[in-house]
Amino acid sequence: MARNVLESSLLGAGFSIIFQILCRILTFGINAYIVRHVGREVLGIMNVRLLLLESTLLFLSREAINRAALSANAQQGDRCSWAQLINQMWLTVPICAVLCAPCLYIWLNWLSAVDAIYASQYEFACYAVAFSCVLELMAESAVFVAQVFCFVKLKILLNTLHILVRSAIFLWIVTGDRSAAINAFAIAQLSSAVTIVLGQYGFFYFYLKGFKDFVTQQAKKKPVAPKAWQVSLYEHMDDFPFKQLSDFLPGVMFNPNGKHFNRELQTLTLSFVKQGVLKQILTEGEKYVMSVSPVLSFGEQATYDVVNNLGSMAARFIFRPIEDSSYFYFTQTLSRDIKLAKQPQERVRQASSVLNNLLLGVSSIGLIAFTFGQSYSYPVLLLYGGPDFVAGGLPQSLLQWHCLAIYLLAVNGISEGYMFATNTSRDIDKYNYLMAIFSVSFLVLSYILTGIFGPVGFIFANCINMLSRILYSTYYIRHQYRPLSLDPLLGLWPGKLFGCTLFLAGIVCYWYQSSDLATHLGVGVLAGLACLLSWALAHRDLVRLAWRYGRRIKIE
């Protein structure tokens, strides 16, 4: 196998960022339309309650299995066959089906009730979301294969397609009947799930036929020179084990090990299951608190969700794709069960350098967001939701404090992701107990601080929680690299020049807040360019490295 894991990870991160930007622009546009024309309460039901149901089912069903399978494929390829991996991925479907029963009962009977005029639509939407999750997971084996064999463009293409299908169907129904917005959401969810399944299996149906013809042609004594797109798709795929589409189904593929499941893989999966439940609570904790207790009305929940989504743009556009790609890179580069001193030192040094650069990049973005967010929260929210939306000052206060959470979220995503990628099963089990403490503390803090500070209390609780997790993961990284005299955590400090420029930019932008909007925005653009220039001057080597990889990606 000659696939370049680092290059594929960078390519995946780059395409994912572009995809996230395009799709989130579309999503934000739809949300703005709903806020202005349908109502905040409907937006709260869809974006908080129903998407929380989808997030809960999908995360608990596949996160642990997917992470464990990625690690097993990279580090236990001789002990864990592809047939066992495919069987393992198909476990997500019955797991999700089983989870649907208690989740639907809770969502329909235990959580705070919706208004009577939306009750029937809400019930239908809950069942539709649950079924769409089961349907989507039927393509999980194909999604996993595409990830392992670096089909980066396929992932981006299908993700874009399913977002477009979901958005188009939703808007088509809502523009015809605004009162059917929740039903439209449910139908759109089902349609997007069907798109994912058909897209994944449709691609591999044609890919397997083309790959077979390519191999046959190249085996001839005088093979015809392959076309560029054939080389891109089929070259360096000698280890691709699938011969027919039915190999993606459970129990069909030939299994040299004899057993349907791998015991070590199941042990690792169970470790991630415990961790996954806790991580889901930490990720969506504020939504669970809002749903379980009547802290906020659906309208207030929608306000918080809109501001939270705007504040999380950097996380969705940039941090999450980088986190996913870096996790994949570290699992494929470093072994969990062997100390770094006993692993190939070239790989270890490369991993240390990559971790350092990742921390440098995301922490710099987080500091920029925090600096400019203090001065530009109000104009952003005014342009997004209109004067009525920003009235009262709550949305502005939420977004300003959320900018602090962005920095902590950026650092935590990379440091904790690295820790998860290199932990042993025993280390993961130990950390699960700490995650339990974090989870309980976060929920308690959310409830207490919300009672004191209102919705801003959710952000305070989240910041305290992330800071605690950062301290633990950075301690792990420092302890792991100390014997090698390497310190990738140096990337957390972007440098004096950049720091001083940011500080001055923040003061200048804050000073011009009372000016007219055009002047304020113009000052912000100039200050932002100054910050970017100072960062580039302070980190010339990293800029040159990014430029080289960017050119390679463009050429390919």
From Swiss-Prot:
UniProt signal peptide: none
Lineage of the species this protein comes from: Eukaryota, Metazoa, Ecdysozoa, Arthropoda, Hexapoda
Keyword set, alphabetical order: Endoplasmic reticulum, Membrane, Transmembrane, Transmembrane helix
PANTHER family, alphabetized: ENDOPLASMIC RETICULUM MULTISPAN TRANSMEMBRANE PROTEIN-RELATED, PROTEIN RFT1 HOMOLOG
Pathway annotation from the record: Protein modification; protein glycosylation
Any one annotated GO CC term: endoplasmic reticulum membrane
Gene Ontology BP annotations: dolichol-linked oligosaccharide biosynthetic process; glycolipid translocation; protein N-linked glycosylation
Key word Transmembrane present: yes
Family of the protein in this entry: Belongs to the RFT1 family.
Name used for this protein in its record: Man(5)GlcNAc(2)-PP-dolichol translocation protein RFT1
Membrane-topology descriptor: Multi-pass membrane protein
Classification via Pfam families: Rft-1
Coiled-coil boundaries: none
Transmembrane regions listed in the UniProt entry: 10-30, 41-61, 91-111, 129-149, 156-176, 184-204, 353-373, 389-409, 440-460, 461-477, 489-509, 517-537
Purpose: Intramembrane glycolipid transporter that operates in the biosynthetic pathway of dolichol-linked oligosaccharides, the glycan precursors employed in protein asparagine (N)-glycosylation. The sequential addition of sugars to dolichol pyrophosphate produces dolichol-linked oligosaccharides containing fourteen sugars, including two GlcNAcs, nine mannoses and three glucoses. Once assembled, the oligosaccharide is transferred from the lipid to nascent proteins by oligosaccharyltransferases.
Protein location: Endoplasmic reticulum membrane
Alphabetical list of InterPro entries matching this protein: RFT1 (IPR007594)
Organism of origin: Drosophila melanogaster (Fruit fly)
